[in-house]
């Protein structure tokens, strides 16, 4: 249906609730949720380009609750990392630890919002047909679209919590600056509140160069995936893996070779070069550092000490956090449980800190709308 002449939203419930006497079955998480598409017409990007129709896909769990004044009090948005999807969070290791019965963000009492960002999942992306004619979107465009999805599409006027992993963590910082009174709390995971610089930026440039400098890319108009995508995926593997866990998983030369071969085959089979390129280049405008004082909601930033993307020796969070009025930084030590950059998707390790953040919110340290 049309909504105010500029957007439409359609929904199809996949499976609202799957219950047993013991609660939600772990194997059923992949079937849970209501999926919807929100269409934004004539969407203007920061670089001046316009997309006639921008499709934003979202999965939701639970229902919004409103107070006597009509403000939504239980909505939580979870923002995915580069190349991820909202439904990627619906796993036993993530959803089972946070959204299940009795958990901190139980979907029976919370309205969980899991968007697919621009360029990923079932949202509009280059591989839909435009290829390299697709607008060169940036994080600022993604956050703008997320806000419109939540406010115009889902009719949510306030968020209990904004949280995200990796790219989603970076966008969480941006949410806190751009919409400071819109949320009660912020949880950026595996990110830093500084400019896209140093090795992180270099890795992204190497990914971009591997694809753009490959003659098979053909300016984005390839028919088969260019071989440059192979080198780009190799960079991603090295940056996001955990040396400790890789040695445990592959303690010999042969097992190491087999492991990385399987990893590459799996990722190459499901990745489009243009989508991958755009996803990494989207970070080009990221730098929340000038506006950290604008963040007024309680913020808890969590990184792990074995994260090669945001290595702890840089000390960026420690230097920046004093500028955040209600900010706190936690660095999780390396252990048999951590998984490098991927620790962001293992709430069993860090959800105790989330509980502390929610306690702070309940005590009323957040912004007053």
Predicted regions and their residues:
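Conserved hydrolase catalytic core segment
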Residues: 159-162, 166-197
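Catalytic active-site module of serine/aspartate enzymes centered on a nucleophile-bearing elbow/loop
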Residues: 327-369
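Catalytic-loop region of hydrolases
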Residues: 26-75, 86-88, 365-369
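Conserved acidic catalytic loop of the alpha/beta-hydrolase fold
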Residues: 140-160
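Conserved alpha/beta-hydrolase "acid-adjacent" motif
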Residues: 308-314
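N-terminal cap/lid subdomain of alpha/beta-hydrolase-fold enzymes
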Residues: 59-128, 316
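Alpha/beta-hydrolase-fold enzymes
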Residues: 182-266
